[in-house]
């Protein structure tokens, strides 16, 4: 028996389904919207990314790595920075003058963090642990390669080691290094952390590697080896000091061993018990050289020259996937892209496409009268162009749905109980489609007075009317029957 209480039930898997006919799990894609801001300042440039959107008591903040590559020489033109933009509505962003670090002798910029060396990634999160000290409310993680001093090596004989460094800040602008975290990994991607109020612990999702045969000892590999595969691992901690052994995420039996870059895993705040991730999928297409002659960004031999100079950075392509989980370790993942590469132009089908910003934000709809939606962001352009951070939207809970075509389908749940007095559904039908809901006893027999009739429309919160009061069934074991035609059901909730 499954107790739904008064929690939102997402139709993102078939965990509560006992029987179904004509139903599939449909993945939806976000809508492309406006450019939120352009990284076109002298201290920004064509190679900006590894970004994070946060809504905190201090407002809406957008952190990103800012750097620029001269693609005539394939060299960085300045040391990478961590920059911060701000917004009041999540649609348009401004760059505040933080006046912390100088670029070309001027501090009139939005640089929030600067190193005297190259850095790969720096991810910020706001710590919602109520016991967190005030000067640590903002935390940041940096994956760094630490090299041994000249003529020396580390205990294992290596000339360098990869570590995850922890920084703290009271205001999210002035960061102070604290320590290395006791976590083993490679960390050469966007490593993220957060406090999980449901399990009362910290999660860190980070980059590591394995080999295709899974025979290498952990951390004993060369990432350049063609057998190496980029993966995502997770570790947890109650105190941000002592960490569990990292575990590789699993995606079910027979799941393709895709190479995954940034993971973008977070709690889905609208529904208890769910994690959602939007990892970037990486594929080196060096084995298809003739195709590059016809692919975009090759009209002036730019890609050919990049392949010759940097190898995989010119021959690899990337897109964004979707994965969901109930425990943060075992994920259901589609093999189709969540954010695909669009029609070819001079700024896409490149290594670095579809690296979505970590986090999402509830924003007002663009059309009057429509309900709020979820905004996400992704950098685009780059290479010979300043990076543009574009906004994308999706309806609330709209990542996946139970779907039936016009021919129809049915779902009968396992025995469940609920705690609310009313039922609301997030659904969409065609003009001829419908959804019918019946409440049944544990044997599947429809209960008198608890049939909705045909429901049609497109609403994230449609009330469902029954002939009798739901209060009479509160806490009682029953089943729910859904009958579909040309319909998507995204979620439902007893309130």
For each predicted feature, which ranges?
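Carbohydrate-active catalytic/glycan-binding domains of CAZyme proteins
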Residues: 1-495
């Amino acid at each position: 028996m499954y107790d739904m209480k008064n929690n939102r039930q997402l139709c993102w898997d078939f965990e509560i389904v006992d029987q179904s006919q004509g139903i599939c799990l449909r993945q939806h894609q976000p809508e492309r919207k406006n450019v939120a801001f352009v990284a076109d300042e002298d201290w920004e440039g064509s190679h900006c990314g590894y970004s994070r959107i946060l809504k905190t008591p201090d407002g809406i903040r957008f952190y990103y790595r800012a750097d620029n590559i001269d693609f005539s020489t394939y060299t960085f033109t300045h040391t990478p920075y961590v920059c911060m933009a701000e917004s009041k509505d999540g649609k348009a962003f401004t760059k505040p003058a933080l006046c912390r670090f100088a670029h070309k002798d001027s501090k009139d910029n939005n640089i929030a963090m600067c190193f005297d060396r190259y850095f790969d990634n720096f991810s910020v999160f706001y710590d919602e642990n109520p016991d967190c000290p005030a000067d640590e409310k903002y935390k940041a993680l940096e994956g760094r390669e630490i090299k041994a001093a000249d003529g020396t090596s580390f205990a294992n004989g290596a000339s360098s080691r990869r570590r995850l460094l922890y920084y703290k800040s009271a205001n999210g602008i002035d960061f102070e290094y604290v320590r290395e975290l006791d976590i083993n990994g490679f960390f050469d991607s966007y490593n993220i952390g957060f406090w999980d109020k449901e399990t009362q612990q910290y999660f860190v999702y980070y980059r590591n590697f394995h080999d295709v045969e899974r025979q290498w000892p952990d951390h004993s590999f060369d990432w350049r080896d063609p057998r190496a595969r980029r993966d995502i691992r997770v570790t947890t901690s109650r105190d941000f000091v002592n960490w569990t052994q990292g575990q590789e995420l699993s995606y079910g039996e027979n799941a393709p061993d895709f190479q995954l870059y940034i993971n973008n895993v977070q709690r889905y705040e609208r529904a208890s018990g769910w994690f959602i991730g939007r990892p970037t999928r990486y594929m080196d297409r060096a084995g298809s050289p003739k195709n590059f002659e016809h692919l975009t960004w090759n009209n002036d031999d730019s890609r050919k020259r990049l392949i010759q100079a940097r190898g995989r950075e010119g021959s690899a392509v990337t897109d964004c996937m979707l994965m969901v989980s109930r425990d943060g370790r075992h994920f259901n993942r589609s093999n189709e892209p969540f954010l695909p590469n669009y029609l070819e132009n001079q700024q896409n089908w490149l290594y670095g496409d579809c690296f979505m910003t970590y986090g999402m934000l509830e924003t007002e709809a663009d059309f009057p009268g429509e309900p709020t939606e979820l905004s996400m962001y992704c950098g685009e352009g780059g290479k010979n162009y300043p990076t543009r951070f574009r906004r994308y939207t999706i309806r609330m809970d709209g990542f996946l749905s139970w779907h039936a075509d016009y021919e129809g389908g049915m779902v009968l749940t396992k025995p469940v109980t609920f705690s609310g007095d009313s039922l609301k559904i997030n659904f969409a039908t065609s003009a001829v489609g419908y959804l019918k809901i019946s409440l049944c006893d544990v044997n599947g027999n429809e209960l008198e007075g608890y049939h909705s009739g045909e429901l049609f429309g497109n609403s994230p919160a449609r009330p469902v009317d029954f002939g009798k009061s739901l209060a009479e069934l509160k806490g009682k074991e029953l089943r729910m029957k859904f009958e579909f035609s040309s319909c998507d059901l995204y979620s439902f909730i007893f309130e």
